[in-house]
């Protein structure tokens, strides 16, 4: 990872581009009737990254820019993003049904759950992300005439800064259960920052709180040069179309704690769902296998965790 600690971004640059790519995949999955995110395509258009806009609206076909059979291409993204979208949608529906009335979306990006989910009365949704990302999405959705279906509190702060204080200032009541999600986030945090975020979530949570998270595997023993070259070869045609996303620059490798085990050690109970199982559960196509699936979405695991009464501070 070479991004400096003081780097910032919007939805068209650096890490923010990955949020726009995910929104483009949601736009395709929406058009295919797999999920329903009516704001995904308009937001991608508003960001203005030509490659992603063309893909989102169907002008660019994945087979035109993917290496045939590659597990790293665009072709697998709509299904995998749709599966995780359903997972976290259902996570919030279950949390609300259990009486939780505070939701926190960490690194919210172009997430539109505050606007598209049917929240119960009294629900407060907190979105945390970079100031430029928050400002862009809020402005773009207002121009579309979209209105949140819950009490939406935007928290414009970098997760590398004191976001806990900013969240409390925005009105989070840590004496009441909270439903948190960390979707598409941990791969862009250093291993120690991942632990720090989980510690902060635990400190701000009361028993009965829930956390939905997307966990990436350990890659400490991988040859970083070989991994980088495999990714660059798989995305070579993207660059031919004017789009380059150097995942090696914006993501972190290294030895990570297993998210499920780490949370259990801090008082949470966890239920794990591997990506392959999630895709199968929703009748979605499997992702092509790789020599080492830790570099693909096949290596991702989803956790639903609940904080018990014996948590470890």
UniProtKB/Swiss-Prot annotation:
Cell membrane keyword on record: no
SUPFAM superfamilies: S-adenosyl-L-methionine-dependent methyltransferases (SSF53335)
Binding site for S-adenosyl-L-methionine: 129, 158-159
Keyword check for Cell membrane: no
Gene Ontology MF terms: methyltransferase activity
Assigned keywords, A-Z: Methyltransferase, S-adenosyl-L-methionine, Transferase
Record-listed E.C. numbers: 2.1.1.-
Pfam families cross-referenced by the UniProt entry: LCM
GO BP of this protein: methylation
Enzyme class: transferase
InterPro entries for this protein: Ppm1/Ppm2/Tcmp, SAM-dependent_MTases_sf, SAM_mthyl_Trfase_ML2640-like
Coiled coil: none
Family the entry assigns: Belongs to the UPF0677 family.
Its job: Exhibits S-adenosyl-L-methionine-dependent methyltransferase activity.
UniProt name for this protein: Putative S-adenosyl-L-methionine-dependent methyltransferase MAP_4064c
Organism: Mycolicibacterium paratuberculosis (strain ATCC BAA-968 / K-10)
